Amino acid sequence: MPDLDRIVKDIAEEMRARPDRGAVASYIPELARADPQAFGLVVIDGDGRVAAGGDADIAFSIQSISKVFTLTLALGMVGDRLWRRVGREPSGSPFNSIVQLERENGIPRNPFINAGAIAVTDVILSGHQPREALGEILRFMQFLAQDDSIAIDDRVAASEKRTGFRNAALANYMRSFDVIENPVDYTLGVYFHHCAIAMTCRQLATAGLFLAYSGHHPLAGHSVISAERARRINAIMLTCGHYDGSGDFAYRVGLPGKSGVGGGILAVAPGRASICVWSPGLDAAGNSHLGRIALEMLVKRTGWSIFGV
């Protein structure tokens, strides 16, 4: 990766010096403990070459980034039948909004807003006990990251459960339309726990490689999903991956990506690399403030936007 090491390290240094860092998520108490000065960036290509800068090996709560992987699992289980229970359109609303559910008969707008991810989690749960479903999700993450040490932060999961009243409202509302088929408490329990998986930038970038290489994970040595499915997941990441900031992210960065309120962003440069950036301070839409700026810098300096140089 010519010059990429220098590019990544330069960006990390520039981000360290910026005073405008956004606000750390406070509605989940455990997330409020994150260090607002933290910043990490990792880029991994298909040969396993790594460019890393900043806090690349500090674990953080991946939160909604897990939704990329639960979507992948659910599609593997039920295929396109999933789209009977969740849509594929941008929401234009906050990630935990209930307004669209009321207007659209309990069908979530896409799998990356909270309601959609809860519905996807319910698909994975069907036919399993909650512990089994959660174990399947965790093992999938460990496999993709090529690291069996990845675990759930139980303190974050418990914190989410204690304060997850809006998510409970979303799940119960969907249950009234039979979009949720399992006991709501079971589905929410699995959802809270997979959002509480803790990973580093290096681990997440490794996990996302299959999306950068047409469904093939070059480090694992075989295909995870078909090229067509990888392309479609990337499309949903581009249009829906940053809640009501998705259009701005596509405009500024031009890569498929998925954010989480833990401050992480997983981004995909198709055919080139998988990227993870982490900075806990968020913008008004709940996306990493410096993370988006760093990715915009990276794309400008590498020419990796899917829309051209």
UniProtKB/Swiss-Prot annotation:
Report whether RNA-binding shows up as a keyword of the record: no
Where does the source fall among the domains of life? Bacteria
Gene3D superfamilies in alphabetical order: DD-peptidase/beta-lactamase superfamily
The EC number(s) attached to this protein equal 3.5.1.2
User: Which reaction equations make up its catalytic activity?
Assistant: L-glutamine + H2O = L-glutamate + NH4(+)
* Residues binding substrate, per UniProt: 64, 114, 160, 167, 191, 243, 261
Q: Name one GO biological process term.
A: glutamine catabolic process
Subunit arrangement? Homotetramer.
The protein in question is named: Glutaminase
Q: Which SUPFAM superfamilies match?
A: beta-lactamase/transpeptidase-like
Record-annotated disulphide pairs: none
Pfam families listed in its UniProt record: Glutaminase (PF04960)
Keywords per UniProt: Hydrolase
Similarity section? Belongs to the glutaminase family.
Does the keyword section mention Hydrolase?
A: yes
Signal sequence residues:
none
Q: Which PANTHER family match?
A: GLUTAMINASE
Q: Which HAMAP family match?
A: Glutaminase
Query: What GO molecular functions are on record for this protein?
Result: glutaminase activity
> From which organism does this entry originate?
Methylorubrum populi (strain ATCC BAA-705 / NCIMB 13946 / BJ001) (Methylobacterium populi)
